[in-house]
């Protein structure tokens, strides 16, 4: 067994998560926020409805009236852009976003986004410079001009060919004690959802780290079986990949490759070439610079 396989081999395909929520999140029900509008502790909820032309988001939040929010729709493994909408929060905290549905098939990610730095001064001042006063489970970091800023985000992942309604997902964070350590660990759980494998993983990687998912087929190349995402605030992440229909045995590979485009704090923790990485998941990259990367491998033998 290769050394970098050690952490991942104990995790196999289990159950069908459609029967219940993942341990990494809970489905957010529509409800009236507990905190008043304009509170630094932001609450947001809602649902997504899909028809042949439109992806519609109907939601509620305690963001102040007039706050601008955006809806972005992305299709996995596609470079399509421009599928967005923008609206303002109403006096009662409600909002509606309508995004044109792309005319291609595939799993889609819908994100609702609020950035204090994009608001008028009155609203921006409520949440501090770069959103540093924001609180709650919907707060994420992003980097701009080498500075870490804060935003509010909630979303949903769905296949429009299989789903017509889905809730926005409320995250539940559980940051490990060794979060951000260069001795990286990844604990994945693979669940089969119809024609997809959904990979949920816990790790101690820093928020914003780019992780990739591919499928390694023995003895041959196969395209179109990949996904990528950014690590969440507690080191967790999830990705989805189509289940191969012809292969009997293959390996799901999760990788993290440090590079010059990482956030500043990640460069300090891991090194731009991964030179500070350690632990059983470290693998030498195939380059002349001697770079290091993280790789977790999960052998899969599909169920009938």
How should each PLM-predicted stretch be described?
Residues 1-78, 85-220, 227-304:
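Serine/threonine-biased, Pro/acidic-interspersed low-complexity stretches characteristic
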């Amino acid at each position: 067994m290769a050394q970098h396989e050690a952490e991942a081999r104990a995790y196999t395909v289990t159950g069908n998560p459609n029967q219940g929520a993942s341990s990494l999140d809970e489905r957010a029900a529509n409800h009236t926020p507990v905190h008043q509008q304009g509170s630094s502790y932001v609450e947001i909820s809602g649902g997504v409805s899909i028809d042949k032309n439109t992806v519609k988001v109907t939601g509620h939040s305690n963001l102040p009236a007039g706050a601008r929010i955006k809806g972005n729709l992305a299709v996995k493994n596609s470079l399509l852009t421009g599928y967005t909408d923008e609206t303002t929060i109403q006096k009662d905290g409600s909002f509606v976003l309508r995004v044109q549905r792309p005319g291609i098939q595939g799993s889609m990610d819908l994100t609702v986004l609020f950035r204090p730095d994009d608001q008028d001064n009155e609203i921006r001042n409520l949440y501090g410079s770069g959103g540093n006063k924001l609180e709650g489970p919907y707060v994420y970091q992003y980097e701009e001009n080498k500075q870490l800023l804060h935003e509010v985000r909630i979303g949903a992942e769905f296949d429009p060919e299989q789903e017509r309604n889905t809730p926005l997902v409320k995250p539940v964070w559980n940051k490990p004690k060794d979060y951000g350590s260069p001795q990286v660990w990844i604990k994945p759980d693979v669940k089969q959802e119809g024609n997809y494998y959904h990979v949920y993983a816990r790790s101690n990687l820093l928020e914003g780290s780019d992780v990739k998912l591919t499928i390694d087929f023995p003895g041959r190349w196969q395209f179109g079986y990949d996904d990528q995402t950014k690590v969440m605030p507690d080191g967790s992440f999830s990705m989805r990949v189509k289940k191969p229909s012809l292969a009997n045995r293959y390996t799901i590979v999760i990788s993290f490759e440090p590079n010059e485009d990482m956030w500043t704090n990640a460069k300090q923790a891991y090194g731009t070439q991964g030179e500070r990485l350690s632990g059983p998941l470290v693998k030498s990259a195939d380059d002349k610079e001697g770079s290091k990367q993280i790789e977790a491998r999960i052998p899969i033998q599909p169920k009938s």
